[in-house]
């Protein structure tokens, strides 16, 4: 009967073959994507944890985390959110200090910054702003504080475009200025940032790189370190609050003294 209906048989055969191949591809795609992501994370030394502090993070915080059992390495990160005008609109850009050994960028075009007035921008920034490599960009503060409180300058020359491992899709996260959404990021040399405080601390857990990302073993390894770091929170917050309060009180006392001296 098959020989009498070769065309029909072959049609059914190839339909089944195509369906089986498609199903097998779908089933294996997730695993392949996870393996590729894990390899990429290892290549760029992606962080396992990120610590944030609303009042800023200090070298003491860095030292405490570094001494925590299960921590392989810690890195202090500096960032600042700024505004960039595009015609009649503006976009929020997160400026990030380049940090050796963690979250390494992949240069898509151009090169890495070599001077304080050079900048490596998000590929998305070039598309949205219409800027090109070699152009100069000027940023403004989105708060009452001048940009000079955070950076050595406000105008930079674009020397390249790049991607970052923790921005895997088009979403760049939420911000505290502008419309509340970050449109793109840009990378600067660490010495371009003037503050002694860190806005972020990146943590790599001991043994995490040997585990496959997204696996239960990886999650358990990182979770154990996270729990120990969270135990430092109360003491770190109290220490930072006291330091900020003391600094503020000293400024008030100095101002009062100046007023008293002027009245004499």
Predicted feature residues:
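Basic-flanked hydrophobic alpha-helices used for secretion and membrane insertion
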Residues: 31-264
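Alpha-helical transmembrane segments
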Residues: 19-26, 30, 241
């Amino acid at each position: 009967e098959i020989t009498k209906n070769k065309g029909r048989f072959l049609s059914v055969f190839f339909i089944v073959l195509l369906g089986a191949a498609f199903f097998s591809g779908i089933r294996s795609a997730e695993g392949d994507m996870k393996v590729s992501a894990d390899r990429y994370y290892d290549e760029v030394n992606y962080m396992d944890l990120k610590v944030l502090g609303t009042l800023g993070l200090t070298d003491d915080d860095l030292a405490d985390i570094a001494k925590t059992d299960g921590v392989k390495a810690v890195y202090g990160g500096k960032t600042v959110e700024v505004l960039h005008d595009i015609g009649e609109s503006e976009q929020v850009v997160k400026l990030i200090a380049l940090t050796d050994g963690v979250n390494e960028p992949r240069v898509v075009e151009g090169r890495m910054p070599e001077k304080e007035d050079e900048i490596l921008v998000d590929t998305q920034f070039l598309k949205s702003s219409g800027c090109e490599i070699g152009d100069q960009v000027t940023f403004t503060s989105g708060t009452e504080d001048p940009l000079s409180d955070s950076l050595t300058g406000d105008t930079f020359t674009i020397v390249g475009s790049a991607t970052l491992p923790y921005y895997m899709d088009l979403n760049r996260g939420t911000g505290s200025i502008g419309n509340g959404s970050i449109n793109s990021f840009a990378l600067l040399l660490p010495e371009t940032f003037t503050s002694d405080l860190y806005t972020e601390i990146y943590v790599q857990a001991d043994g995490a790189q040997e585990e496959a990302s997204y696996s239960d073993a990886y999650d358990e390894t990182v979770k154990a370190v996270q729990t120990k770091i969270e135990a430092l929170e109360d003491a770190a917050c109290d220490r930072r609050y006291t330091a900020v309060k003391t600094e503020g009180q000293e400024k008030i006392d100095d101002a009062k003294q100046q007023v008293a001296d002027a009245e004499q």
